[in-house]
């Protein structure tokens, strides 16, 4: 039963991703690729131009919408009278999640304004692991026994707990299914 449910959801996800691109999206991408000013547009983006605010027009730069509290806004287009108009909007599910969660709480600053990266030694700074995704990594220590002299040594590293990894994967999958 679990496998049939899993494969059913997987089938629906693949079907959704296959049907999500319309012919209009494909022609817009082909037109953009064939434009003469393609290189100049890339150079302009690389200069670090500002993002487009919510409810402002994004017809010329569909990937330049600003980020909300947590999620990035999407450029939604509406064709009216032969002319297309695009506006940066926040997805409904993102609005609900952001209103429920509120502002992202700031984490306390670790020692020396630096945190211990993933898989690095955290034996001396067990509470200073970096943040990975939504959650902060945890310092996990293991007792290692040396084969040659039989001594036990403690090996510590910043790792992501399985529960956190599963929650992040589920949220990513849900976001992919909805949006």
From Swiss-Prot:
Propeptide intervals in chain numbering: 21-47
The entry's keywords: Amidation, Disulfide bond, Knottin, Secreted, Signal, Toxin
Disulfide bonds: 51-66, 58-75, 65-88, 77-86, 115-130, 122-139, 129-158, 141-156
Record PTM text: Cleavage of the propeptide depends on the processing quadruplet motif (XXXR, with at least one of X being E).
Tissues showing expression: Expressed by the venom gland.
Any Pfam family matching the protein: Toxin_35
Top-level taxon in the UniProt lineage: Eukaryota
InterPro entries the record matches: Spider_toxin_CSTX_knottin, Spider_toxin_CSTX_Knottin_CS
Signal peptide from the UniProt entry: 1-20
Motif range (Processing quadruplet motif): 44-47
Main localisation: secreted
Record localization: Secreted
GO molecular function: toxin activity
GO cellular component: extracellular region
Location of Valine amide modifications: 178
Similarity section: Belongs to the spider toxin CSTX family. Double-CSTX subfamily.
Domain text: The presence of 'disulfide through disulfide knots' structurally defines this protein as a knottin. This toxin contains 2 'disulfide through disulfide knots'.
Stated role: Spider venom toxin that exhibits cytolytic activity by forming an alpha-helix across the membrane. Lethal to insect larvae.
Name of protein: DELTA-miturgitoxin-Cp2a
Lineage of origin: Eukaryota, Metazoa, Ecdysozoa, Arthropoda, Chelicerata
